[in-house]
């Protein structure tokens, strides 16, 4: 099974290391770990490579989070992918920092990036990898997800990226349930 991994985030250096950009962070880790470089297309960056005769495409949308769905007509066409190849990596404020959840399908909840994707695709039947970023009720939701991780939190997030960069490329139609168990039981 070919895999299209789309990490959500906001473009620009001012969003680096923010909670909302963990999807970008994991894509960056995968690019670095596999000695790749991102190439620029019209409204996204991508890297394309093979693992065990499977095509893996990594994507960072260059639209802002709320418009993430706009890239999919171009991406599916360019890379000959379909919705069943899609895995979206996204932040989740309902999960504690350092916890992850892999799902085959799901809803958008309060996440505007997922809502945009689901609207663009006309479906919610695509894979999601949620990365817990914690929650702080002292902040409003928008301010919290746009806040940067502190140093100790960033160490934990990097540990999550290290773990996921080992696990995520092995996801296929035969191993998905096993990967759900492995990833969902992890905590950093």
From Swiss-Prot:
GO cellular component term of the entry, any: cytoplasm
Enzyme Commission no: 3.1.1.29
SUPFAM superfamilies: Peptidyl-tRNA hydrolase-like
Active-site feature positions: 20
Molecular function as annotated in GO: peptidyl-tRNA hydrolase activity; tRNA binding
Location relative to the cell: Cytoplasm
Record: residues binding tRNA: 15, 64, 66, 112
Site positions per UniProt: Discriminates between blocked and unblocked aminoacyl-tRNA: 10
Gene Ontology terms describing biological process: protein quality control for misfolded or incompletely synthesized proteins; rescue of stalled ribosome
InterPro entries found in the cross-reference section: Pept_tRNA_hydro, Pept_tRNA_hydro_CS, Pept_tRNA_hydro_sf
Key words, A-Z: Cytoplasm, Hydrolase, RNA-binding, tRNA-binding
Broad class of enzyme this protein falls into: hydrolase
Self-association and partners: Monomer.
Role according to the record: Hydrolyzes ribosome-free peptidyl-tRNAs (with 1 or more amino acids incorporated), which drop off the ribosome during protein synthesis, or as a result of ribosome stalling.
Listed NCBIfam families: pth (TIGR00447)
Name listed for the protein in its UniProt record: Peptidyl-tRNA hydrolase
Native organism: Borrelia recurrentis (strain A1)
Gene name, Swiss-Prot/TrEMBL: pth
